[in-house]
From Swiss-Prot:
Keywords: Carbohydrate metabolism, Cytoplasm, Hydrolase, Magnesium, Metal-binding
Subunit and interaction comment: Homotetramer.
Binding positions for Mg(2+) 2 per the UniProt entry: D112, D115, E277
Gene Ontology CC terms, in alphabetical order: cytosol
Family the UniProt entry places it in: Belongs to the FBPase class 1 family.
HAMAP family referenced in this protein's UniProt entry, alphabetically: FBPase_class1
Protein name: Fructose-1,6-bisphosphatase class 1
Organism listed in the record: Proteus mirabilis (strain HI4320)
Metabolic or biological pathway, per its Swiss-Prot or TrEMBL entry: Carbohydrate biosynthesis; gluconeogenesis
Binding site for substrate: D115, G116, S117, S118, N208, Y241, K271
Keyword Cytoplasm in record: yes
Compartments, as annotated in UniProt: Cytoplasm
Binding positions (Mg(2+) 1): E89, D112, L114
Coiled coil residues, start to end: none
Length: 335
């Protein structure tokens, strides 16, 4: 049995000039995940369910657990001293950590502390998403927004934690995707899936079909394609949609499938956030042999213009994403 800590240190040895700072940063995320895991498991017994009566910068009602997870992760990252600042779904602006250690830190972190938190009340899987970059401003001074507005192809590491029937941490540093299952009796994440890859073909599509009437024509046509009977392509495909990006992505990663959150009439730019949802998942997808785009362009090549920028998102098994892109190109949006 190999723990997450042992695995990270082992991989660090492949890089002679590694300083251990990224290892310490990942350790902070690991600690935050353990704390969130502990408290999610007793969410119905303590007063952390439901909303807190305020909205975030995107106008979405903030769940109590959203804010709780945000504070725990922020505290864990700040305490390690390897992070200069964070960007979070739950923060209106970037959070600049103060002090000499923070100003001399090399990294910034973007995160969705609790993806799918509206599912908590009904005991459905939720997750944490994180993305790590080297800062681009000079060491020795506070970070700026420019440090966070980098394209996804500059990510140093990315990953997610899925809190389900078991808690798993899945991450990449650009050398494959590896998954670790939490053993609560030992208090450690243990390697359970090394070098994870999407299956070459898939037969699941994950999309909220309740919004069908609002979808672009290309997405409507792709859904109909998925529903048609054709033995040569193993259709019709199966619909599986949980409503938590982490949970849907995780299932499709292991089983083969595509996740789509397109633009809609009410969200013409899409709804998922580029920096702390699409980019980290796209990095993981490509490292696992999959693909991620906005229906046309590679997600990791898109230059962000604002912290909470939204983006249509197509991610999963490479062949399925390419098929969906073909429908988007063939059937432009209805006028």
């Amino acid at each position: 049995m190999k723990t997450l800590g042992e695995f990270i240190v082992e991989k660090q040895q492949d890089f002679p000039h590694a300083t251990g700072e990224l290892t310490a940063l990942l350790s902070a995320i690991k600690l935050g995940a353990k704390i969130i895991h502990r408290d999610i498991n007793k969410a119905g017994l303590v007063d952390i369910l439901g909303t807190n009566g305020v909205s975030n910068v995107q106008g979405e009602a903030q769940m109590k657990l959203d804010l709780y997870a945000n504070e725990k992760l922020k505290a864990a990252l700040k305490a390690r001293g390897e992070v200069a600042g964070i960007g979070s779904e739950e923060e209106d602006d970037i959070v600049i950590f103060e002090g000499d250690r923070a100003e001399n830190a090399k990294y910034v972190v973007l995160m969705d502390p609790l993806d799918g938190s509206s599912n908590i009340d009904v005991n459905v899987s939720v997750g944490t998403i994180f993305s790590i970059y080297h800062r681009i401003t000079p060491i020795g001074q506070p970070v700026t927004l420019d440090d966070f507005l980098q394209p996804g192809n500059r990510q140093v590491a990315a990953g997610y934690v899925v809190y389900g029937s078991s808690t798993m941490l899945v991450y990449t540093t650009g050398c494959g995707v590896h998954a670790f299952t939490y053993d609560p009796s030992l208090g450690v994440f243990c390697l359970s899936h090394e070098s994870v890859h999407f299956p070459p073909t898939g037969n699941m599509y994950s999309i909220n079909e309740g919004n069908y009437i609002k979808f672009p024509l290309g997405v409507k046509k792709y859904i109909k394609y998925c529903q048609e009977q054709d033995a040569t392509t193993n259709r019709p495909y199966t619909t599986r949609y949980i409503g938590s990006l982490v949970a849907d992505f995780h299932r499709n990663l292991l089983k083969g499938g595509i996740y789509i959150y397109p633009s809609t009439a009410s969200h013409p730019n899409g709804k998922l956030r580029l920096l702390y949802e699409c980019n980290p998942m796209a990095f993981l997808a490509e490292q696992a042999g999959g693909k991620a785009s906005n229906g046309k362009d590679r997600i990791l090549d898109i230059k962000p213009t604002e912290l909470h920028q939204r983006m249509p998102f197509f991610v999963g098994t490479k062949a399925m994403v390419e098929q969906a892109e073909a429908f988007m190109a063939q059937y432009p949006d209805e006028e």
